[in-house]
A protein has these predicted regions:
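DNA transaction DNA-binding modules
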Residues: 41-46, 50, 70-87, 203-204, ...
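P-loop NTPase catalytic core of nucleic-acid-dependent motor ATPases
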Residues: 227-316
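A short beta-strand-to-loop transition that corresponds to the Sensor-1 phosphate-sensing loop
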Residues: 346, 385-395, 413-415
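Phosphate-sensing "switch" segment of ASCE/P-loop ATPases
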Residues: 382-384, 400-494
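AAA+/SF3 P-loop NTPase mechanochemical coupling elements
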Residues: 373-390, 405
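Conserved catalytic/switch belt of AAA+ P-loop NTPases
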Residues: 357-372
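AAA+/P-loop NTPase substrate/partner-engagement loops
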Residues: 302-355
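Conserved glycine-centered beta->alpha loop in an early N-terminal alpha/beta scaffold
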Residues: 3-16, 27, 33-265, 332-333, ...
Length: 639
């Protein structure tokens, strides 16, 4: 055996098989017909093409490849005319014209221009439905495919058209089981595009949505005909599919009625907040929080499960989420919920309590943050209009929370009282029985007279609650009361709707909502809790922040700013409020002086320093007068 590597026979044959052609030959059919005769010997043909092209280049003829391609196209097998072939997939969802594509149990293929069989996809695949989103008007395509003889059901994902139109993006379908890679991606794109074009009128069109709740045509997802879910998030798809009637309606109704007639107002408020969710947009309100908190082991999570079971699967981790996600994930969840309650459990898992306000403001805005799109412009902003029902072992509104956060939240502290007599049994029962009340409640809203009665009763509750209670709190509470009243009329018929007297203890007044009022109360308590910091006695080894004389705390401005910033209060905002409300004494140099300060000069620790002169409460200060209310009489109600 020689040491030289054997040269393939086809390579040895290529050189002698290519004649010497002239420039005139290249302008005729002669060389192209000669080469085309070797079309079935692909490797040899490529060798011959390379040598022929070299000859043409030597003769300064630059059109060789264009002439070759034209000759091949003119002499390749004629494509089947449009509509000659039809899809012949076993048990196919529908039959479509396939043009020159051969569509059978072995997949999709076509005849190439050299007469060869080209595989587009190794298994059956076809477009079956055009999907148009009711909100964005974006079109998607539902494709159907199945692989292997053991797969009886067709997989039918809904895919964005920009994915199906791109050979780079369509490869992502491999994650869903489609046999696509970089080799056949381009052919698969062409096939799906051609199939839609050939069968545009035959492929049915379906309306779709990517969220729960009210749709532009007045229907309510998922309780609507002719609308499918087209979202890309598989987790949201599972939640959407969980919005169905499961188990026994009478069993669920028994738990709900027992809760409504029970002693736990917090549990009843959670249920009312669930029914209130689709009413927020109807009554032209913004989203608001109902936060249930107290010691562990009293059934607060089961209260959330009861609220969730009105609509769908109440298991924690499915419809009910936790506060552990990012702000973006919470935005996505809120926009998916749309007009059903946004339910979040376990606030305490968040490490940074100062971000509580951010969550409240973000979710109560009802619109996602504006963000740039990858291809330029802005992303489509998402919207929601609902109630946000949350739970924790602590309040969500802190002493230093902004007034906007406080008024957007109804905080329900159940103390140590259990919400249910047997929380474990209630939880297990709800997991097996859910989804009945939501559909019936929405059906009741289709009656124009019911809608008008709803608006009337909400206005009456608003009027009865108005007074010292902050306006946003009044609006939220009136919606909760109206929702519970409507649920009683449409579902329960037990006369156990919440009353003004029952909800009022959880509402806050205008003064309680004012962050500066809360800052003043906190400061007074902080000063009282740190007496040594205001004692200039030489025996005091620690820091001296000021002195207290005649009911006035002279607080060194440096230390004052430090403690205020530590609690996330604004010193300048507070001092402006305190000056306007007579809570401080300050130096005054005249109306037109630019030297007016919010401080006074006071000797502390042997040196005169700028101090905030804060007037402390005295024994004569009166407690806030309770808000007086006129009870709403059932006889006056439209339900």
């Amino acid at each position: 055996m020689s040491g030289k590597q054997d040269v393939p026979t086809e390579v040895q044959q290529a050189k002698p098989l290519v004649p010497q052609w002239t420039l005139e030959d290249f302008m005729s059919e002669k060389p192209y017909a000669y080469l085309y005769a070797y079309k079935d010997k692909k490797f040899l043909l490529q060798q011959m093409l390379n040598r022929a092209q070299a000859q043409a280049k030597a003769l300064k003829f630059s059109g060789f490849m264009r002439m070759w391609n034209s000759y091949v196209e003119a002499n390749s097998p004629k494509q089947t005319i449009l509509g000659d072939y039809q899809t012949m997939f076993p048990e196919q969802p529908l039959q479509l014209r396939s043009g020159h594509y051969n569509c059978d149990e072995f997949g999709v293929s076509y005849t190439g221009r050299m007469g060869e069989s080209v595989t587009v996809c190794s298994h059956p695949i076809m477009p079956v439905m055009r999907v148009v989103n009711l909100d964005s008007k974006e079109e998607k395509m539902q494709i159907a495919f199945r692989r292997g003889s053991k797969q009886k059901e067709w997989s039918t994902p809904i895919i964005s058209k920009d994915v199906l139109a791109s050979s780079q993006k369509i490869i992502s379908l491999a994650r869903q089981g489609v046999a696509v890679n970089s080799e056949n991606a381009k052919d698969l794109v062409s096939y799906l595009t051609d199939m839609e074009s050939m069968n545009y009128d035959e492929i049915p069109t379906q309306n779709s949505t990517g969220h729960l709740g009210w749709l532009p045509d007045g229907q309510f997802s998922p309780y609507c005909e002719g609308v499918v879910y087209d979202g890309d998030n598989p987790e949201f798809k599972r939640i959407f599919d969980g919005f169905r009637e499961t188990g026994s309606e009478s069993v669920w109704m028994g738990i709900a009625k027992a809760t409504r007639s029970g002693k736990s107002v917090p549990a009843r408020l959670a249920l009312a907040a669930s029914f209130a969710a689709p009413l927020v947009s109807i009554l032209n309100a913004l989203p608001f929080f109902v936060h249930i908190w107290g010691t562990q082991g009293c059934g607060k999570t089961v209260g959330l499960m009861l609220a969730a079971s009105v609509w769908g699967n109440p298991e924690v981790g499915k419809y009910i989420k936790t506060f552990g996600g990012t702000k973006v994930s919470q935005e996505l969840y809120a926009s998916f919920c749309g007009n059903v309650p946004i339910i979040l459990d376990e606030l305490q898992i968040m490490a940074d309590r100062k971000s509580f306000d951010d969550i409240i403001y973000m979710l109560c805005e009802g619109v996602s943050k504006g963000r740039g799109a990858k291809d330029g412009g802005l992303q489509l902003q998402r919207h929601w209009s609902s109630t946000i029902i949350t739970s924790a072992e602590m309040p969500i509104v802190q002493s230093n929370s902004g007034g906007g956060a406080a008024v957007r939240t109804i905080e329900v502290n159940y103390g140590g009282e259990p919400l249910f007599e047997d929380s474990r049994t209630v939880a297990e029962t709800l997991k097996q029985n859910y989804g009945f009340a939501g559909r019936k409640f929405i059906e009741s809203l289709k009656d124009p007279e019911t809608l008008q009665a709803l608006r009337d009763i909400q206005k009456r509750y608003y009027s009865q609650l108005s007074g010292e209670i902050q306006d946003k709190q009044v609006l939220a509470a009136s919606i909760l009361l109206a929702a519970d009243k409507l649920a009683d009329a449409a579902l329960f018929h037990d006369g156990k709707a919440l009353t003004v007297e029952e909800i009022k203890p959880y509402l806050i007044t205008r003064d309680q909502a004012d962050v500066n009022v809360r800052a003043y109360n906190w400061l007074c308590g902080y000063i009282a809790g740190n007496p040594r910091r205001f004692d200039a006695n030489e025996e005091n080894p620690g820091e001296v922040w000021g002195v207290i004389e005649s009911g006035i705390c002279y607080f060194n401005r440096t230390f004052f700013d430090r403690v205020m910033h530590a609690e996330a209060f604004s010193p300048s905002s507070f001092l402006t409020w305190a000056d306007r409300n007579g809570k401080i004494i300050r130096e005054y140099y005249g109306k037109n002086s630019g030297n007016n300060r919010m401080t006074v000069r006071k000797k502390v620790g042997g040196a005169k320093v700028a101090c905030v002169a804060l007037l402390l409460p005295t024994d004569d200060d009166k407690a806030p007068v309770p808000v007086m209310m006129t009870p709403v009489q059932d006889d006056d109600m439209p339900f």
